[in-house]
Structures are given as C-alpha cells and as structure tokens.
Amino acid sequence: MRLAFMGSPGFAVPALRALHAAGHDIVAVYCQPPRPVGRGHRIHKCPVHEAAEALGLTVRTPERLRRDDAERAYFRALDLDAAVVAAYGQILPADMLVAPRRGCINIHASLLPRWRGAAPIHAAILAGDAQTGVTIMQMDEGLDTGATLLAEAVPIGPEDTMVDLLDRLADLGAALVIKVLDGNFPPVPQPEGGVTYAPKLSKADAEIDWSASAAVILRRIRAFRPWPGTETRLDGEALKIIRAEPAAGQGEPGTVLDDRLAIACGDAAIRPTLVQRAGRAAMQAEAFLRGHPVAIGTRLG
C-alpha cells in the first residue's frame, strides 16, 4: 500500500518500522522539524526523523502545515492509499484528511472516547484507571472524534509509569495498524457518552501539591515520569521525586515526619525512594539523606 507516515516521538517509531517491515511503500515521512535542545542548544532530530533516515525514507518537516500551501499540495500529489498518523504534533487541514483514498488513520493511545487529546497515557494513570489501550481511528476534523476501526485494551499495573505504558502501547499500536491496513474493519462511530479529555501538559504541572491525597500524589509521580516530572522545594532548591511509596503517618501537608523522609500529604504520607537535586544525578533516598539530612518537621514546597 502506498503510504505517508506522520509522527514525531518515540511512541510512533514502532509503527513506522512495522509498516516498513510489512512491505508498505512509505513515500513520505512527516515529523516535527529539528530543534535546539539542552544548554548547548544543539540541533536535535525527533525519534521518527532519525528512524526514517535509518530506513532510507524521505523525510518532510514543515513548520506549520495549515500555513504551508506548497507542502499541502505536495501531500495531495503523493497519490496515497492512506496516511498513518501517530502523535505527529500538528493538526491536519481538511484537504489533507481527505486526500488519501482511505483517508488518514490515527494511532491513539487510549480507549476512545475516553482521553481524547494530547496526553492520554498520563491522564489514564492520573485518574487511577484500571486499563487503557490503543484505538485505531479514521481521522476527521475533530479532536480525536473520528470513527473507531479497531481497539484493544491493556491493563495498568499498580506500579506502571508513563514510560512502562508508552512502550507497551507503542508496540500494540504498531500491530493494530498493520491489521487495519491488511483487513476490512468497518468504521464505528464513537459513543456520545464517556468522553473525557487529556490536555497537553506543561512544566508547571510538575509542582507537587502536598494537600492532595497520598494516592493522587503517587499517581502523579508515576504519570509524570520522566516528563514533566514531579518536584517540590527543599531549602529553597528544587528536588525531583522520581519514585515513592506509601508511608505511615499524618501531619501538616508537606511536613517531614521521620528521619527516612516520610512526607505528610492531605490524608496520609508518602516516602520518596528515588530523588534528584537540581544539576545532580538521581540517587536513592537513603544516599541523599546521608549527604543531606532533613530534619523532622521540615516543610517542603
């Protein structure tokens, strides 16, 4: 099948590789442009860009498709059977959605209509969902509102982080989109009920609100690993909490309760087990406390 592939982050790479391995003719790969990253502002290509070049595929990196008439004309002229989209990072204009003979097919990391939007994996963990999954969807002009072609659920374990689920869902999405392209799956409109949204996250979401329940804070730590992370303030400096576990005790939210760094939350307490100071490597909490003792009664945040 003659395809375009549109994706940017690591989540999309397994699908690109699976389509290529299955023998589909991928005539163009669209992804976000290279951007400066880190303190040195070195130009960095996104994971899909690097994977596509390794496969010898043509890469297109338009900055804004909606404003790029020439790029949209190029896309329409590709004579595509379908376009496969996976976390591309841009909204596709209407003329592109209908250009391929089978339209544009999206790999979405949730069981639609639950968690439409930019951060469905994070949202599922934050909500305490027992499961999530992947939906292969026929795209329309709405935000993840298109008809469902195929979906499969994945359980969320009590210790699963965003990265754990990301890897499993990426592999599942690759397998499901191959099935859809090779088979005949009639589109099923999404139900009107059960719609929830997963908005885009920002660095501001990293700050821990210690007045929240221990369960909510633990879910945030799992959901926001590695980005945007979860952090608090200790002695005026940022302290990232990368892993944590439930702990006994109660107190004023944000207060250190014992010499092993149990921290009071809105209803109970948590104990960080892996932390990171600004500019330092991550370390076990025990090692951190040996070099940086924290007195009982210290307030964080």
UniProtKB/Swiss-Prot annotation:
Annotated CDD domains: FMT_core_Met-tRNA-FMT_N, Met_tRNA_FMT_C
Keyword Cell inner membrane assigned: no
Gene3D superfamilies xref list: 3.40.50.12230
Entry's Gene Ontology molecular function annotations: methionyl-tRNA formyltransferase activity
EC number: 2.1.2.9
A GO CC annotation given for this chain: cytosol
UniProt keyword list: Protein biosynthesis, Transferase
Amino-acid positions noted as binding (6S)-5,6,7,8-tetrahydrofolate in the UniProt annotation, renumbered to this chain: S110, L111, L112, P113
Record has Transmembrane as a keyword: no
Catalytic activity as recorded in UniProt: L-methionyl-tRNA(fMet) + (6R)-10-formyltetrahydrofolate = N-formyl-L-methionyl-tRNA(fMet) + (6S)-5,6,7,8-tetrahydrofolate + H(+)
Known function: Attaches a formyl group to the free amino group of methionyl-tRNA(fMet). The formyl group appears to play a dual role in the initiator identity of N-formylmethionyl-tRNA by promoting its recognition by IF2 and preventing the misappropriation of this tRNA by the elongation apparatus.
PANTHER family, alphabetized: METHIONYL-TRNA FORMYLTRANSFERASE (PTHR11138), METHIONYL-TRNA FORMYLTRANSFERASE, MITOCHONDRIAL (PTHR11138:SF5)
Family: Belongs to the Fmt family.
Protein name: Methionyl-tRNA formyltransferase
Gene: fmt
